[in-house]
């Protein structure tokens, strides 16, 4: 169950578009990927999974945070397995999974500290105008 939001579909569809984008980016042949200015692969994983976990923590209640973490972890493991199986210039790397976990933990920790439910706060700000 989502938080009480005025635009739940907007937030949920946007989150799923982020997921789809992450899956596509992780399964594209490595030579097709744009350069991100020397940012390490592990940093990309940490930031990406941090953003995903924080996004979903913004639209789901705290009781769902463990499920968000598990779902993103499973997604990351499946993607790494597919990278190894697809033979498109990508390879499975257990260190990527570890980086994903760091990102998930960072995102959910930020959500627990203050950023959880951010979508409700944004909607409240737009309601006042």
Where are these predicted regions, by residue range?
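Bulky hydrophobic segments
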Residues: 1-94, 101, 105-129
